[in-house]
């Protein structure tokens, strides 16, 4: 306990006080004889009577409420509400209005709001709720009188006390409390709780923190949030709702008093209540809520809050002023008693300069946090450190085994560590968990600062993440890998910590994020052969190399080597897997690597690149064809030695297929290296790409003796070369006198003129071979009857072509005549275009000498409109 308030006696006189109201340093007394008296109370000038109205009413003044901003005093006397003007002292409570509709009122409550309009104008809205018998009747103040809100609530009993906050009106009956939500079209009733669990007690309600209800139940003060009773889109339909403060999860638990409350006022941050034998001052925070007991005011009947730090208390004929002790004095006492929360609340409402106030609050938070940490309340301590916005490094210093290295410029230690408790086992784990939560918040704050690219923030973030790493290793190591991927941990300190805990996989992540790829790959190579290691095998190395990308190509080649030697098939996936990083590797350099060190993988690599990735690079196609050709040559050589070579047929088929289907290789370059004594069929494909038809046909006829392939080739190229069948016949009718290539004998069927084959081709393709061109090459002794079929087909074809040409000429001549006649008809069409004519497109008139277009349907448009329409049609 400490002294929060001092008591000053104001008046001891013969008037019988029936009600009391106050604002600022003014207090208004309502007497049993109907008098109104206003006093001004000042610490320096003392007590001064400002207004006095001896004959305001013939009946007692039972209740008063002041609206200081509007200089209005609402008075309840003779069961009716009246309004006075307290603006001018000389007026002595000038009467303004008496509300006849309030006749029968036993008590009332008010709601004052100052909404801001869209234009920025602030107006005061005053609403009054009167208890008239068993009804609540609502009014509003406008144009100096009370007007009906046309809202009436029927009650089950006569209310004893009322309190209005926003959309809710709380009613205290002799045995229970009820809240009415008046935000909807119809009032909604919500039952709260009984006034007492055992006997009937007078209800007591007070407004807490301007938006909460403080309600007395037995010896408790229950804080209720009225917003939970507001109907929102028909969701809250319950009529019996448990108060927030009665819920075990509420932050404001019921406040115990020495005896049931008789009266209560709220003076931030204290609840000041009148109990049986004294006035008690209590705080809503902390374990020990009792702040002060004022036994000398045990005879009081009334309490009223006037202003911040000022309360008036009254007995039947006495008046006291209760003033708050200066906050710095209270704060000093509270800090000595280690009541840090209350010290913070008091400092928040002090009149000290904002900067000084913020600094003081920060210091109290740090003291409170240190006290909580010493008491092993780690989670609460970290929350206080967070509120103090302390340097996270100073919090980390509370854990000596977590401090990575001294931080430059921190000789002035904010949080002393000498008195911190030694932590072991469960306490240490709880402390680590609390520290993790705190550092997670601190990390978010530092990341925001990093956007300003401040190096100090980067350094602090590094310390935070390194500390988090150590905490995770002690509490939940599954969080280590995600933390390392954020790439803010200190390399050397984290490396040492991970090695100490044998976290090899996490160490790889650290190296990877820090760009220490060589160290990571060395470690992977070492662990690959260790039995039982989490990194045993090749897969992790393969995946790591795949993710490096083209910027680290030398490193990929260096560490892919051992994988390729160990398992070529798996190792090849380093360069062929379906990953963006893999596909983007420079393929020419990868090819050079395979050619120089792993030649057996050149063909599989190029096949994947060309077949799967559809690479059309000429170099790659040329190299693959060269590899195919060289391998086929080696297999042929082995076959000549009598060895079995099952690979020969499929490999030669691959070579033939690629030469036939690929359009991306360079045929002239391939031809330079291609052998002339073997693979002549493949050579023919290359020559065909070079359009050397005579050479191709010579190979098919004179070397291979394959008339079918020669004929098929001629048919395939007939459209581009109409004389190709003439070339084919010449190959058959004029055999060469010597071999086409050294060491390659001529085919025996075509070393001499083969008349049968020649006649068969002539008869089959007669329409494609001109007799005038071929006759000079026919043997002189060839009988004419053998050529009869060929000549008949050929001549018929020529006659049909001539007849078709004649018919076409006739058709064209007739069409020309028709078009000339149609043109003449169009030229003979006349139309009138004058100043009244308008364009059918833009609806504007035609100006003199303007260009226009006339459509066949008779519509006439400007030339520019026609062009615009034509462009629009073209775009569609």
UniProtKB/Swiss-Prot annotation:
GO molecular function, one term: small GTPase binding
Similarity annotation: Belongs to the VAM6/VPS39 family.
Organism: Drosophila melanogaster (Fruit fly)
Classification via PANTHER family: CNH DOMAIN CONTAINING, VAM6_VPS39-LIKE PROTEIN
Residue runs in coiled coils: none
Protein name, entry field: Vacuolar protein sorting-associated protein 39 homolog
Null mutant phenotype: RNAi-mediated knockdown causes impaired autophagosome clearance in fat body cells of starved or wandering 3rd instar (L3) larvae. Conditional RNAi mediated knock-down in muscle cells disrupts transverse-tubule (T-tubule) and myofibril remodeling in internal oblique muscles during metamorphosis.
Disulphides: none
GO cellular component, one term: HOPS complex
Keywords: Autophagy, Cytoplasm, Endosome, Lysosome, Membrane, Protein transport, Transport
Lineage: Eukaryota, Metazoa, Ecdysozoa, Arthropoda, Hexapoda
Topology with respect to the bilayer: Peripheral membrane protein
Function summary: Part of the homotypic fusion and vacuole protein sorting (HOPS) tethering complex involved in endo-lysosomal vesicle trafficking and lysosome biogenesis. The HOPS complex facilitates docking and fusion of lysosomes with late endosomes and several other types of vesicles. The HOPS complex is also involved in autophagy and crinophagy (the elimination of unused secretory granules through their fusion with lysosomes).
């Amino acid at each position: 306990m400490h002294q929060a308030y001092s008591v000053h006696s104001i008046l001891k006189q013969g008037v019988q006080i029936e009600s009391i109201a106050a604002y600022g340093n003014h207090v208004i007394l309502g007497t049993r004889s109907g008098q109104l008296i206003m006093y001004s109370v000042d610490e320096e000038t003392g007590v001064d009577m400002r207004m006095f109205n001896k004959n305001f009413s013939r009946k007692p003044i039972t209740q008063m409420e002041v609206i200081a901003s509007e200089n209005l005093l609402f008075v309840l006397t003779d069961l009716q509400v009246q309004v006075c003007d307290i603006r001018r002292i000389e007026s002595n409570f000038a009467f303004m209005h008496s509300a006849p509709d309030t006749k029968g009122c036993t008590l009332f409550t008010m709601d004052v709001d100052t909404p801001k309009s869209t234009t920025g104008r602030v107006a005061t809205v005053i609403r009054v709720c009167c208890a008239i018998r068993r009804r609540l009747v609502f009014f509003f103040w406008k144009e100096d009188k009370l007007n009906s809100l046309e809202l009436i609530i029927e009650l089950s009993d006569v209310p004893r006390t009322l309190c209005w906050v926003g959309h809710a009106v709380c009613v205290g009956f002799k045995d229970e409390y009820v809240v009415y939500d008046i935000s909807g079209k119809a009032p909604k009733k919500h039952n709260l709780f009984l006034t007492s669990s055992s006997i009937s007690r007078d209800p007591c309600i007070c407004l807490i923190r301007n938006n909460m209800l403080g309600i007395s139940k037995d010896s408790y003060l229950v804080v209720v949030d009225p917003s939970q009773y507001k109907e929102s889109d028909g969701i809250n339909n319950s009529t019996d709702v448990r108060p927030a403060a009665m819920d075990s999860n509420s932050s404001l638990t019921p406040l115990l008093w020495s005896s049931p409350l008789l009266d209560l006022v709220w003076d931030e941050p204290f609840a000041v209540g009148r109990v049986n034998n004294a006035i008690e001052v209590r705080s809503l925070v902390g374990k020990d809520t009792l702040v002060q007991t004022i036994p000398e005011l045990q005879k009081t009947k009334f309490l009223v809050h006037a202003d911040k730090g000022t309360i008036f208390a009254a007995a039947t004929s006495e008046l006291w002023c209760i003033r708050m002790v200066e906050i710095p004095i209270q704060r000093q006492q509270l800090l000595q008693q280690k009541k840090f929360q209350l010290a913070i609340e008091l400092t928040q409402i002090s009149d000290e300069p904002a900067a000084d106030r913020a600094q003081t609050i920060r210091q109290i938070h740090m003291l409170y946090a240190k006290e909580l940490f010493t008491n092993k309340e780690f989670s609460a301590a970290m929350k206080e450190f967070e509120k103090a916005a302390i340097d996270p490094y100073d919090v980390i210093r509370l854990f000596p085994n977590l401090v990575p290295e001294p931080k430059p410029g921190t000789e002035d230690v904010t949080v002393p560590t000498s008195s911190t408790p030694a932590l072991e086992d469960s306490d240490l784990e709880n402390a680590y968990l609390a520290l993790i939560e705190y550092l997670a918040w601190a990390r978010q704050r530092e990341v925001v600062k990093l956007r300003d690219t401040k190096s100090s923030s980067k350094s602090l973030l590094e310390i935070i993440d390194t500390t988090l790493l150590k905490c995770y290793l002690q509490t939940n190591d599954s969080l280590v890998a995600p933390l390392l991927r954020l790439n803010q941990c200190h390399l050397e300190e984290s490396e040492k910590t991970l090695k100490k805990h044998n976290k090899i996989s996490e160490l790889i992540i650290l190296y990877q994020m820090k760009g220490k790829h060589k160290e990571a790959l060395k470690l992977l190579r070492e662990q690959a052969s260790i039995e039982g290691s989490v990194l045993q095998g090749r897969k992790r190395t393969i995946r790591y190399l795949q993710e490096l990308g083209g910027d680290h190509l030398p490193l990929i080649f260096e560490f892919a080597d051992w994988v390729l030697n160990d398992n070529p098939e798996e190792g090849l996936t380093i360069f062929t897997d379906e990953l963006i990083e893999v596909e983007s590797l420079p393929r020419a350099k990868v090819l050079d690597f395979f050619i120089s060190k792993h030649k057996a993988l050149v063909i599989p690599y190029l096949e994947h690149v060309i077949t799967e990735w559809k690479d059309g690079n000429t170099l790659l196609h040329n190299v693959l064809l060269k590899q195919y050709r060289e391998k086929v040559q080696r297999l042929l050589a082995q076959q000549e030695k009598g060895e079995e070579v099952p690979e020969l047929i499929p490999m030669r088929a691959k070579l033939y297929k690629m030469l036939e289907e690929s359009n991306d290789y360079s045929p002239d370059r391939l031809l330079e290296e291609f052998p002339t004594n073997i693979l002549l069929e493949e050579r023919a494909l290359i020559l065909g790409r070079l359009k050397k038809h005579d050479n191709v046909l010579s190979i098919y006829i004179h070397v291979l003796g394959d008339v079918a392939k020669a004929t098929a080739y001629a048919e395939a190229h007939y459209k581009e070369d109409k004389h190709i069948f003439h070339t084919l016949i010449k190959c058959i009718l004029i055999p060469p006198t010597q071999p086409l290539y050294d060491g390659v004998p001529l085919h025996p069927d075509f070393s001499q003129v083969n008349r049968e084959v020649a006649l068969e081709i002539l008869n089959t393709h007669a329409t494609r071979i001109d007799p005038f061109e071929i006759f000079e090459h026919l043997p002189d002794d060839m009988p004419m009857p053998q050529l009869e079929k060929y000549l008949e087909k050929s001549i018929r074809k020529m006659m049909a072509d001539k007849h078709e040409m004649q018919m076409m000429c006739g058709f064209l001549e007739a069409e020309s005549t028709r078009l000339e006649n149609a043109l003449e008809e169009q030229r003979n069409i006349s139309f009138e275009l004058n100043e009244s004519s308008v364009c059918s497109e833009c609806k504007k008139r035609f100006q003199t000498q303007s260009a226009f277009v006339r459509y066949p349907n008779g519509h006439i448009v400007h030339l520019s409109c026609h062009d615009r329409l034509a462009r629009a049609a073209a775009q569609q």
